[in-house]
C-alpha cells in the first residue's frame, strides 16, 4: 500500500485536488504491483516552504512511501509523471518539484501487520 503525501506552498482548489487524485491513481500503476485500489493520498496546501532562500515561487515536496519495492522499479517513470502532473495542474516548475521515496519494511492496516519479508 503506497502512501503519498504532497506539500505545496500554494493554494489547491477542490477541483485541482480531485484532478491530482485521479491522475495519481493512474500514475501509481507505473510502480509494479501498485494500484489506486490500495493508494492512500494526502494533500497539504499553503505550506511554508522555502527553496534556495526564497518562498515566492511555487514548490512541491512529495513523499512517496511504498511497501515492497526495495528494487525501486518504476520510480524513474513515476518521478517524471508526477513532476509533469504538478506542473500542469498547479503550475509548479519541474525544477521545483521534489520527490522523496521511502521504503516501508512493515505496514499495519485493518488490524494486521504486513512484513515485506513474508512476501519474498
What is each model feature region?
Residues 1-120:
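Interaction-mediating elements
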Amino acid at each position: 500500500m503506497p502512501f503519498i503525501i504532497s506539500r505545496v506552498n500554494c493554494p489547491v482548489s477542490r477541483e485541482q485536488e480531485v484532478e491530482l487524485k485521479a491522475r495519481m491513481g493512474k500514475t501509481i500503476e507505473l510502480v509494479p504491483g501498485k494500484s489506486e485500489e490500495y493508494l492512500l493520498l494526502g494533500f497539504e496546501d499553503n505550506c511554508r516552504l522555502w527553496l534556495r532562500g526564497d518562498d515566492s515561487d511555487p514548490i512541491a515536496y512529495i513523499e512517496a512511501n511504498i511497501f515492497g519495492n526495495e528494487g525501486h522499479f518504476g520510480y524513474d517513470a513515476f518521478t517524471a509523471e508526477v513532476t509533469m502532473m504538478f506542473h500542469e495542474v498547479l503550475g509548479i516548475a519541474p525544477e521545483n518539484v521534489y520527490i522523496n521515496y521511502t521504503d516501508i519494511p512493515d505496514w499495519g492496516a485493518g488490524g494486521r501487520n504486513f512484513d515485506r519479508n513474508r512476501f519474498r
